[in-house]
Amino acid sequence: MSASDWLALKTTLELAALTTLVLLMLGTPLAWWLASTRSRMAVVIEAVVALPLVLPPTVLGFYMLVALGPNGLIGGLMESLGLPHLAFTFTGLVLASTLYSLPFMVQPLKDAFAAVGTRMTEAAATLRASTRDSFFSIVLPLSRRGLLTAITLTFAHTLGEFGVVLMVGGNIPGQTRVLSIALYDHAESMDYAGAGLLAGGLLAASFLMLLSVYALNRRYRVVHP
């Protein structure tokens, strides 16, 4: 791997870690609300959350680029406050990746929270436990498999992002150039050895992360049938 590839690896890991952290903080309360609410708006919110699963990445990337650019809703607001717009920046990349990976965090958490049910939290409420205490002491510990799955899927998905990253962040070394774009650059320049090395690394990393999740889940089912 060249120096630029190592720099792309660093950017990729930073992007995946920050995206996962942001989604963990935002997706957890959203997933809990979706799992426990009876609001009619829940169906609409679920559809919006799942939209990145079926929407072409370039479509989402285009709208994010427009929104984050100098004439967009977010970028224009930033510039009116004397701040630079977020198009072709690492911060903008994190925002776009957060939106694109949203269903990979929310859906596993929602399913895990729904599996826990409300019986134990209602029992805790009769003992004057607050909703916050019930969530952190009962719901989250019982949902740890779903939490692990959500974190792993989000991180692995962000590692391989291409379309959204290219549209919103471009290809700026040290800022927005990630491994998937570096792989594309190698392939475009007919450097198949370099492209193969990066592709194999991404494949191995993704496989090992998924393998660890399935192995831990299977072990948990054996210990707690």
Q: Where do the model's predicted regions map?
A:
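Non-cytoplasmic
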Residues: 69-70, 146-185
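Interhelical loop and adjacent transmembrane-helix boundary motif
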Residues: 1-7, 168-207, 211
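Transmembrane alpha-helices and adjacent helix-loop boundaries
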Residues: 55-61
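Transmembrane alpha-helices
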Residues: 21, 104-109, 113, 117, ...
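C-terminal transmembrane helix and the adjacent membrane-cytosol boundary/short C-terminal tail
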Residues: 103, 110-121, 125-129, 137, ...
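Membrane-interfacial helix termini and adjacent extracytoplasmic/periplasmic loops
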Residues: 61-98, 168-172
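Transmembrane-helix boundary motif in ABC transporter permease subunits
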Residues: 19-49, 62-64, 77, 112-114, ...
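Transmembrane alpha-helix signature in integral membrane proteins
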Residues: 5-34, 53, 98
